[in-house]
Amino acid sequence: MPLLFFALAGCDGSPLCGGLSQRNQFVRLACSVTNFQSSAMFEGSESANTQEVKSESTLGSSLSACKKVLCSNSVLDSSEYWLKNDKTLCRIGFLEDQHDSGCPTICFVNLDRHTSDWHDDNYIKKLASVCPELPRLIESLGVRQPKENEILLLSSLEPPDSCQHDPSHPQSPRTADVCLVHCSCGRRPTQTSSIIFEINKFLIGLQSGQERQKHGRLAGQRAAEDDTNRSVSSIEEDFLTASEQLGEDSEEDPFRNDPENSLMPESVKVLRAAHAQKRSEIEREDSEDSETLCTSSNSQKLSRTYSAPARGRPTTPKQVKESAGHYATNLAESVLQDAFIRLSQDEPSFVAEAAVSVSSDISHSTEAPQRARACSFELPKIVIVQSPDNSEEVTEWPEVQSHATSEHDSGNKAKAKHGTHPPHNSPVGHPAKPLEIALACAASVIGTITTPQVTEQLTLESGEEYECEDEEEESETDQGEYSFSSAVCGMSQVAGAVAAVDLADDSGDNEDLADMYSASMGLLSVAQASTAIPLHCSIAEGTSVEAFRANVAEVLLREASAVFTHRQSYSSVANFLETTHNKIVDGITNPRRPYQEQQDVDNFTQEISDSIFQYALEKAEKRKELEGPGKDAPNIEGFLSDCVNNLLFDVLCVTSRKISDISNCNMESCDGQEGSVGYRAYEADSKAGREALSQLQHLIEPSQAYNHGERRSSVEKLSALIGKREREQKHIQEERENEARLKEPYRLALNRVTATMVKEQSDLQGQLGRSDKNADSALPSAESSPLHMQRGRAGGESETRQQSLSSSSGALVALKMDSGESKTPVTCFAEDLATTVVSMATELAAICLENSSGKQPWFCALNGGSEGPEGLLLPCRTAAALRRKETQNGTSVTKKHRPPRLSEIKRKTEEQPELMERLVNRVVDETVNLDEPTTTDPFALFASEVTARIMNCPELSVVDTSKSGQSSRSRLQCERWSSRGKASSYESIPEEDADPSGTSNTLGPGNRLGHNLSRGSSISKQSSCESITDEFSRFMVNQMETEGRGFDLLLDYYAGKNASSILAAAVQQAASKKNGHLNVRTSSCLSKQSSTESITEEFYRFMLKDMDKENKDYSMTKTKEWSNSLLPPSPRTPFCIRQSSVPDRRSSDSRLTVNSPIKANSFDGFAQNVHGDSLNIYPTNSVSSSGLCKSDSCLYKRGQTDQITDMLIHETWSSSIESLMRKNKIIAEPSEDSLELDSADSQPHVQQFANRLAADIVESGKSQLGGQQDVTAAACQPHIPVGERRHGFKHSRCNNSGNRPGVEHQENSCSSYSSSCVRQAWRGQREVPLIHIEPDQREEASEEKGGVETHHREASHQTQQQSGKGSETATKSSSDSDRVSSVATVPPAGVEVERRSLSASSEESGSGSWAQIATEDDPQEETTSSFIQLSEGNGNSSTSSLGLADLEGFPDFSISSNLISEERERKTSHCQDQADVTLVVLSEVTSGLSTAGSSCQRELLVLNCDLEPDCVDGELRAALQWISASELGVPALYFRKTHQHNLTKLHRVLQLAGQKAWRVGDLFSAVAQFCQLHQDLELKGRPLPSLFDWILKTKR
């Protein structure tokens, strides 16, 4: 929780402040801000006065504030320093009000006013425009107008909502990160010192903004600490006696002038000396702060007095006891003052749960030691108390007068003060005694600054009598090491001494002895309680546990499981407690699992719960009977709870032991730990387990000497072991039944425990079943044998970690399958459908090709069902690797079934045309229907399954809808989608029934893509053109090797994102010809086994032959009849994946209703090779999209996937396939083809067929969501006949130069789906585009003769503009074509270098390829933009490339035409000006701030808010802020345009400074001269020019 700073009263030299007017005073506001309460304690320093303010924000959050008092003894205060400062002036930029810069925002609020009326509505409104809480906060604190040398730093501001739309106070979309409240030195400072003073204020504000940026979100909690001048709060002050601090207020304090003052408790001195070393380090850390803020004279004095190191055992003086008593008295006074002030406040009084009270003596004691300990606890920040305005005089402080009267009269003072100011609200029901409140306050001090390690010591001390205090302190000094814990213990003893003094000296008083004694004992007990559980400041200690029962229970259960399985290696008990504490707090602050008494659970969980409860109830009744009916016997509820807990503990123990055994099987020794719980009970069992597991480990490791029998026996042993334990588990469960009052945490626990075991056993059964069936089958893979392990994430869903027995890795490879990381259902669904296009091509090759070379990669006979549900899960990579190993070892690999030759299949299909149709349409023949399993209509089934998939349906099981006469077959059960689609190895697909008599069955799209097996090995090693295709080739080889193991057709295998490469190659090949024939080179393919090239070659041969056949008249009739038999059946809906994958021989106007989203993997290439032959499809019956989920990743855009499909084919070909084909001589080199490419007349039938085939294939790849366009979208996109589309297809395929003839083909259709994201990378035309986006290249842009064509993300739907040199088109998306085509802005030169589309690392290294997709301009929908990853460098670069890129959306900007014309005027001078000062205009184009990589991390946006604008000189302030930012090294400083009324003049000043290469010193000198002139002119009564006018006039 970010901590905020605010200031209370000023330090004006009153006696209260001891005359230290130059001293910094820090006021911190520790806020407990949760959804349950919003209260704030404001406390100050120097005297123990507090003020409490209730921060009543409706948003439930709070400010934090720090007050600083500037002084003039630092190097930054000398004018010489500034005049000689030769640092470079930073850049200045301007932002539109609607633009969210993404960089830290600092708001400077100037409180200068002509009137002191704080209740003026205008003032309140202006303050609220910065933060809604600011006016109330200032008013409730009663803050007077700060002095010139006082500033307030605010952070954690809430965004303004009320004034956001007020045109007179335009605000940024998000609130400022830091706000600095100050009063300026009048309208214009006259002295150089005043100018420097203002600069220092801006320095502090800008530096705070930088700090908040540097530490990220965590800095919110540390910002207060960083902003504080640690050299002031030196550590020696931590243990000052109360008299030394309070004594400054009263010279008549007898103890202060006592010569025994030096004889303080030795332990305190020694502790102080021990901390002296830390002080120097902290001062060194804080040297930057101390340049701006002075150090305290008091702390310097203390440094001289007490920094002598006192090592060894010091001698304890005889006066220790007496001085300890004095010390205790003074401490008691300060604590009682604190209590008294609390009681006398008008605001609601101290609430024990919400507020953290700290007295001034100990106020500094926490910061530095906490930092030194580097404890991971985030303790509440300590608050320093400062006096309010109404107690400026000494006489108003009764405790000072009392102090002069009696040293030890704490009780009397307490009563006197209590009588003078009766409490308004008491924390307890009855009026609390002041001493009790004081002790409670002291206890909260101790609880605040301690850690759990101290609890034990405090517990020991609480048992001792307070008379032993001196001995205890002496024993403290014996330790030799004076840690923070010992200091706290000393403080607790001192607090105990308070009670001792009161008890001894006030015994004759009205105060009751018993009360005193119990209060002193209560102090230590409260201290113990508060140290035992120090909560984060964001959680109130009084928060009810009720709402978080499930979260806390879940955390504790996970920790117990982790302890059992030895997964967490805790270094010590303290480490364990600390970690658990953090997790519990995290579970409370971020509750993910709402607590519900009646939570829906599955039947299995309910049965186990009932069984356990029944069993426990029986046991409890027996124990109740044994106890007897005596009145002292506990009720049955206690017995029942005890039994249930014991039972659950045993279950958890047994299960955890199993998990632990499995996870330990890779370790060197599998010895059980003697100390672990339940070890002896399961010792024999573990021994057997270790035996089987060691053999299992042996079988996993890549060994040269094991055969199938050994593998089989090892797996059987493991199965027997797990089965034995399963039986034990079931035996316990079978004895129980009904559940009535078992709470949810137990249900959750048991659910997880037992589900794991059942899963294990079923998986092993599946493995053994397959081992029986196939002698040469591979080891169980990740999908078929997951050994699920629990892994806790506090308060979240459990992650399943799958341990896959993978032979390639030789170890148990952990695969995380986290539902949070897995893709959204829409993404998965789209990725499934995206691969339909390639399956069409492979079907054709499979069905219609002669297999001349004798290879049989495609088909095998039907293999019948398999016993286990996972029987068909045989991932290609693992299986192929094992099979290759066996072959190397001489093991014979025998195929059970000889696959039929392709010629046989072709003959069958010719004999039975219905078989052909069935094969072509097989995707929709069997699907999942979760609602109506009895439905037999495959189309309805498929539609409902797709709908369920999109609507985020959980785990899908594939229902077998085959006819009753058929042999049963198993289907895949795919639990989750693989996280990110990174791997290209997937599950194989079940077999196809080749028997024509039966209904064909296939797999629904819910199960096509499986888990990724080898995250690292399956990812492209480099983002080169070849790697994508190489990977696909490897996968195809592995897959086809697997085909002989009980699978039917390859055509059900879907290869994911890279699958369309074969089709793209085919389309490209079809579009190019040489002498009327396709170029197929067969000589180099003879030696290749089944690979991508040979498959494609066969496909080409088929197409050649088919085209020749089609060209002859005699075959036309037959072909037409055949294709007409494949027309879509009437009940088919747009959810159909495809109706035909044969090259279209139908009439040219017949349209497919295929809707398949293509997931783009090279969007940047699309924008480069723009063409206008996008094809639209309008299905006859479209489905309403209102109920469907939207994809967050913006990968699919409604109505635009047609062109994405089209462009994907272009780009996949040019980026990856083409070079590989040329390398392998499958297609001719471009040099041989180049002349023929343009002659489209020699063989019209070839050209015709190629165009038609390509157009239909693209048309068939339409997005499913493409049919659900808005009515307006459909209206503005004219329908183009298929023939025209095919014509356009021809042009774009035949021209590789980039200036395609087809570009203008569809220019007239302006889409309402155009994107606001502007293409920013200038590119030269390349034949094969790079995959990653390049940085801007100004040279290329300026050398273009006719202008560069601007490529938008969806450029084929947008009007192209060519507007002079290097222009970029900035469009606000709309369906208004006039707006789109009317404006083009010419950015100055400085923008182009800065404005990169993506992070620098992905551009320069090329190891990660990224594309960026902008969302459509649709106000009703989420318009967020994101980056997708195309290919990774080494399998782990997913975050490295993305790191600095801003993933926020690119906002839409309206066009500011007057600014454009201004900028055009100055374009020439800016382009030539390469000096240090560059003006950046970020109004219409996407700003470099949001995407500029590392440089944006330090840029700052400055807002200025003036209560009365007349009171401040805006130009002078802008110049001083410019100087401050340059001094800090900020690369760029941004202002809001509306806040700078003198925008034009500032532009000219920036130009001037750039031309003259001004440095900071030059600008400062000019400002100083101007202020001096201003003073002279004012005295003479002459008119005063403005700063910018004067600079432009005199400095040219």
From Swiss-Prot:
Where is it mostly found? Answer: cytoplasm
**GO annotation, cellular component aspect:** cytoplasm; mitochondrion
Q: Does the keyword Cytoplasm apply?
A: yes
Q: Where is the composition biased (Basic and acidic residues)?
A: 1333-1356
Q: Where is the composition biased (Polar residues)?
A: 292-306, 959-971, 1357-1372
Which segments carry the region annotation PKA-RII subunit binding domain? 829-846
Name any one GO molecular function: protein kinase A binding
* Composition bias type Acidic residues, residue spans: 462-479
Composition skew (Low complexity), residue ranges: 1398-1409, 1430-1443
Keywords noted in UniProt: Cytoplasm
Q: Say which domain of life the source belongs to.
A: Eukaryota
KW Oxidoreductase (keyword) present: no
Localisation: Cytoplasm
Q: Tell me which InterPro entries the record gives.
A: SPHK1-interactor_AKAP_110
Region described as Disordered: spans on this chain: 214-233, 242-319, 389-432, 462-481, 760-809, 958-1022, 1282-1310, 1328-1443
- Record's comment describing the protein's domains: RII-binding site, predicted to form an amphipathic helix, could participate in protein-protein interactions with a complementary surface on the R-subunit dimer.
The job of this chain, per UniProt, is described as: Anchoring protein that mediates the subcellular compartmentation of cAMP-dependent protein kinase (PKA type II).
Stated family: Belongs to the AKAP110 family.
Protein name, as recorded: A-kinase anchor protein SPHKAP
Organism, by scientific name, is: Danio rerio
Cite the source lineage: Eukaryota, Metazoa, Chordata, Craniata, Vertebrata
